[in-house]
Amino acid sequence: VLITTYNFKVEEFVPDRIKVNARLDQEQLKPGNTTQLLIDALNYYGPPAANRNYELEVQVKEKTFAPQAYPQFDFAISNRSSFFDKVVRQGKTDAGGKAVESWQVPALYANMGLLQARFFATVFDENGRPVSRNTTAAIQTQPVMLGIGAVGNSYYALNQPARFPLIALNTAEKEA
């Protein structure tokens, strides 16, 4: 007696052969600062992943500064164009399965608000299969963030004064 049937698919699963850790020596950066990404690759159940190809990719994007204590204020810089280059570097791990890459925050990122750098480290096993890890760092491009408050009106009469609340906060979200 057949009660029911069920269709299913079987996929081949190949676990990662190496373990990759990536960490930065700094979590907070400023324009002109240099940080180092430390990559550590180990073979599972074996020695360090020596002489393996790796790739580092650094992406910088805008990060929203939105303090919870001041939800009525907008801290965005709205009339600027974003231009963040993607950095890609390649190399080989040393005999201990380690690699170190330095990256300097460009000085031209000054006064661009709050940014975030994301570091993608990819190490390739002996068959060329990638194993990736990422880590992030905040880039504080200015010591004080200026916010303009919402007043609820989107239309103001011609030649009439309009009042807008302003606030200056440091990056710790305290009044400057």
Go through each PLM region and give its residues.
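A structural signal for beta-strand and strand-to-loop patches characteristic of beta-rich domains
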Residues: 1-176
